[in-house]
């Protein structure tokens, strides 16, 4: 793994495929955020020698960019939550209709009314941190633009959920699949079966995803639940290679 500080508030961590494999992770684990992914990020952070200003950060956000031979993780820190009680924002009215200037004036007035004698200094610091956050985003975008100009393009995946009324329907569907599938899972809910399908559409024409979806629903129903819902509320029957496993089943 390699770490590079690209601004005062942003780190770039490059993780090789070997690093992922050693930690029991795959690229598909990062397509849908889950607890396993978050734990992996913080484990990596613990292993690296972080700059001092990141070790006691109020908040950390992670942005993942898959590459052909690695994973780029941009880590952005913010101490904003240490400077202001966000519960107080409920008293400010509809902040979505305020200009930035009106927003800061309203916060300042609220803080002064509550006896905060250091309101001016705190607001100046908040504004400074917000400017740093904007700068970090611009720096990150510039960094990604450079990456896009490199010969390695990001992997591109499409994810589907399909429904089946019976397990026999799911088996029949699996036997019609003659194209590569990156991953597939089988779930059981109270009234039907559900299958998740992950396709790699890298280097495919723009219409490829739509064509593949049309092929999938020739022998399946459009999904009625999301994968996140199934992970939380349904029972997982097969993991990762559901289609391959069901293809082995002989229907009588």
From Swiss-Prot:
Gene3D superfamilies: 3.30.70.1950. It holds the Pfam family MecA. The gene is mecA. It comes from the Bacteria. Signal peptide: none annotated. The N-terminal domain probably binds unfolded/aggregated proteins; the C-terminal domain interacts with ClpC. Enables the recognition and targeting of unfolded and aggregated proteins to the ClpC protease or to other proteins involved in proteolysis. InterPro entries: MecA_C_sf, Neg-reg_MecA. Homodimer. GO terms for molecular function: protein-macromolecule adaptor activity. Belongs to the MecA family. NCBIfam families: PRK02315.1-4 (NF002643). This is Adapter protein MecA.
